């Protein structure tokens, strides 16, 4: 699996996930829409969202745009 892993809106950097990591995720804070920064990467399970945080998970190559 290959996931994007940079904070910019238009991300071009990616990483190859390790064994056991079968999910790509994207997290961002819903309060900061103008200066939106993302956390992206690979995970074994979908990370849990904190208050006011949006988490999106998927399981195909570079799906965490």
Curated annotation (Swiss-Prot):
The keyword Secreted applies. Disulfide bonds join 3-24, 6-11, 17-42, 46-57, 58-63. One of its GO terms (cellular component) is extracellular region. Expressed by the venom gland. SUPFAM superfamilies: Snake toxin-like. The keyword Secreted applies. Pfam families: Toxin_cobra-type (PF21947). Keywords: Disulfide bond, Secreted, Toxin. It is found in: Secreted. GO terms for molecular function: toxin activity. Binds with low affinity to muscular (alpha-1-beta-1-delta-epsilon/CHRNA1-CHRNB1-CHRND-CHRNE) and very low affinity to neuronal (alpha-7/CHRNA7) nicotinic acetylcholine receptor (nAChR). Belongs to the three-finger toxin family. Ancestral subfamily. Orphan group II sub-subfamily. This is Weak neurotoxin 7. It comes from Naja naja (Indian cobra).
């Amino acid at each position: 699996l290959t996931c994007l892993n940079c904070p910019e809106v238009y991300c071009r950097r990616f990483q190859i996930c390790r064994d056991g990591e079968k999910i790509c995720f994207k997290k961002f804070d819903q309060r900061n829409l103008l200066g939106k920064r993302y956390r992206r990467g690979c995970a074994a399970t979908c990370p849990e969202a904190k208050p006011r945080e949006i988490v999106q998970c998927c399981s195909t190559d570079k799906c965490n745009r």
